[in-house]
Design a protein with these regions (language model features):
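Phosphate-group recognition and catalysis centered on beta-loop-alpha active-site segments
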Residues: 1-107
């Protein structure tokens, strides 16, 4: 059986942030569930289509450049992470459940 931190340990840290993912793993989660959007050539981790609920930004995730998205506060000073950054902090045996919200140019 797997125990997944939904959007990380989102009850204790800002959801879908590196802090939430790291905390979930310290709380004996087997892995994490996260949500992804493609923006430019990167995969970013955020749940909502709109930035307003989880960041100090406004508008749709996919209507902004990466530089703007990375400048936002996703809670407690956390930034919107890239998927590659999540791979860097998770243990090699962690389970990863990825919910694809938006991808463009998929071959």
């Amino acid at each position: 059986m797997w125990i997944l931190g939904h959007r990380g340990a989102s009850a204790a840290a800002p959801e879908n942030t590196l802090a939430a993912f790291s905390l979930a793993m310290t709380q004996q989660a087997t892995g994490i569930e996260l949500d992804v959007y493609q923006v430019e050539d990167e995969i970013v981790i955020i749940h909502d289509r709109w930035l307003n609920r989880t960041t100090n930004g406004k508008g749709m995730v996919t209507s902004h450049p990466l530089s703007y998205l990375r400048s936002l506060d996703a809670g407690n000073g956390e930034v919107i992470p890239y998927l590659a950054e999540v791979f860097e902090i998770l243990p090699a045996d962690a389970v990863l459940n990825v919910e694809i919200k938006h991808l463009s140019n998929v071959d």
